[in-house]
């Protein structure tokens, strides 16, 4: 077995693997620079049988001074910062942003996010692998 970097000659094999899995997502654009790691595993016969594809995404953090202004003012400030942040992320080439809400604020703050166009995504079960302590 051999693990190596992806090359364009792997594309058809990866498309076939993707189709055979029958998952509900489009085949990704592997030329997108947000794919920062593309590893292929070949079997002993030299066939591409596995691929690990890592695309950068964005995890959002929001820090708020709860004593600064009244709720209406804080919401207005959040709207302004949200729009500026969205433009900034797009300018940097990002395609999506994710927010993991603490359970105690998820329902209420989730409604605020939805008012800005965010969608709750429970369709897939997220897992996390910490790479550093």
Task: Show where each model-derived region lies.
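Acyl-donor binding region in acyl/amide transferases
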Residues: 58-116, 121-122
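A short beta-loop-alpha structural element at the N-terminal edge
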Residues: 1-14
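Conserved donor-binding loop and adjoining core beta-sheet/short helix segment
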Residues: 31-73, 131-133
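Proline- and acidic/polar-enriched loop/turn elements at helix boundaries
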Residues: 30, 101, 125-126
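C-terminal "cap" of GNAT-fold acetyltransferases
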Residues: 122-133
